[in-house]
């Protein structure tokens, strides 16, 4: 009699969030916001950076590009580290390295050295997201994993407006901001070392070699469809706002108002968890992609009021699609290659965001409608791919 009772109690406790889980999630969200926010932090500071180093604004903007390219590439370079050495160790190492690189950015004497330091910072920052997402999917009880993924997705999405708001409203120089942020990464590393479970000798000592792991992922149609969909999500998101910025005089809208109108809808990331539990992560992601495509179709009508509505719809669609795609990849990957699968997903996500600005400029020269209808079509194709592959069996 006592033994069955004990088993029931253990199962009951294992399916409920504890205080440690809550602290872990909160720390991961704050660290995620601070890490991803570095991608957007220099946008409001372009003029100040140009004045400080005596370069044109177009050159000063490379301070963001240098970080972004290295950040995306870093997912492929470092994405599988936590599969081999453990989530906790890699996260703490990544945050500590980001702190040191952030300090270097603040101390650079010339623009060339600034770009080099920002690239190094991007590489260091790229260590965190795949390992953090893998940690969430493994540490949280199964019923609460979709919520954890939604919270992390929300933090990553909110990083864009939050970082720009911080940089614009603080009145601090780039160096002063970096000096203020560097200790925060170290504090985050210390907090996560305490909050995360003991790492042990390695999380997955029996992990498959890199080549075998990659082959296994490439045999999974559902994962490939999710990677392809990831290319379209931020591509459409950035194309919309780049188009609004470029064509604001013709459209008769205030770009800042359009951005602010879409901000509250990012909270739809929290709706992704119950939707994923009820309908599955692939359907949740597909629904988000379709909503985002409809928003871009609405934007193509080029009416000021409709652009505001499109901004809210697009933010809601992206907020649903991102956690849905993360959960799709995480659920289909095995423990031995989950971080690598999520690293490739994140690389695709930010590659799409990086390609969007120049392609948006080119599409705008063709036709105003093309600027938004082309990414809308890509989003719909991505949704169809997810739906078509969602029932395919995982490769053994």
Predicted feature residues:
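Helix-to-loop junctions at the C-terminal end of transmembrane segments
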Residues: 75-86, 268-281, 364
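Cytoplasmic helix-loop-helix junction between adjacent transmembrane helices
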Residues: 111, 117-156
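Juxtamembrane intracellular "pre-TM" segments in multi-pass secondary transporters
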Residues: 10-18, 197-226
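Paired small-residue
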Residues: 97, 101, 112-120, 305-313
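Helix-loop-helix hairpin linking two adjacent transmembrane segments in secondary transporters
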Residues: 113, 141-196
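Helix-breaking motifs and short loop linkers at transmembrane-helix boundaries and internal kinks
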Residues: 54, 86, 107-113, 301-303
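Conserved MFS/SLC helix-loop-helix module at the cytosolic interface between two early adjacent transmembrane helices
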Residues: 73-109
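C-terminal transmembrane helical hairpin of 12-TM major facilitator-type secondary transporters
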Residues: 282-325
């Amino acid at each position: 009699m006592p033994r069955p009772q004990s088993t029931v109690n253990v199962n009951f406790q294992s399916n409920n969030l504890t205080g440690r889980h809550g602290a872990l999630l909160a720390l991961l969200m704050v660290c995620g916001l601070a890490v991803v926010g570095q991608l957007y932090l220099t946008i409001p500071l372009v003029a100040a950076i140009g004045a400080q180093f005596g370069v044109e604004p177009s050159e000063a903007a490379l301070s963001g590009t240098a970080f972004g390219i290295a950040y995306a590439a870093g997912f492929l370079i470092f994405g599988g580290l936590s599969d081999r050495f453990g989530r906790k160790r890699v996260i703490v190492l990544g945050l500590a390295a980001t702190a040191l690189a952030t300090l270097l950015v603040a101390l650079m004497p010339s623009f060339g050295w600034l770009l080099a330091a920002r690239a190094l910072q991007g590489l260091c920052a790229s260590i965190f997201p795949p390992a953090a997402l893998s940690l969430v999917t493994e540490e949280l009880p199964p019923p609460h994993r979709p919520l954890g993924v939604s919270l992390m997705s929300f933090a990553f999405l909110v990083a864009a407006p939050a970082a720009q708001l911080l940089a614009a409203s603080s009145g601090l120089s780039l160096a002063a901001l970096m000096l203020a942020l560097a200790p925060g990464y170290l504090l985050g590393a210390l907090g996560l070392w305490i909050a995360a479970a003991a790492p042990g000798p390695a999380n997955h000592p029996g992990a498959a070699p890199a080549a075998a792991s990659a082959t296994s992922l490439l045999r999974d149609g559902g994962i490939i469809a999710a990677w392809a969909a990831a290319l379209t999500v931020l591509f459409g998101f950035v194309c919309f706002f780049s188009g609004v910025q470029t064509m604001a005089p013709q459209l008769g809208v205030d770009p800042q108002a359009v951005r602010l109108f879409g901000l509250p809808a990012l909270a739809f990331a929290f709706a992704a968890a119950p939707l994923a539990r009820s309908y599955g992560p692939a359907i949740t992601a597909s629904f988000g992609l379709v909503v985002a495509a409809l928003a871009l179709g609405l934007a193509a009508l080029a009416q000021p009021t409709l652009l505001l509505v499109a901004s809210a719809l697009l933010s809601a669609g992206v907020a649903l699609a991102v956690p849905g795609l993360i959960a799709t990849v995480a659920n289909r990957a095995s423990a031995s290659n989950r971080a690598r699968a999520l690293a490739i997903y994140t690389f695709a996500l930010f590659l799409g965001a990086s390609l969007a600005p120049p392609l948006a400029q080119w599409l705008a020269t063709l036709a105003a409608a093309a600027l938004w209808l082309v990414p809308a079509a890509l989003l719909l194709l991505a949704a169809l791919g997810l739906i078509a592959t969602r029932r395919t069996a995982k490769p053994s």
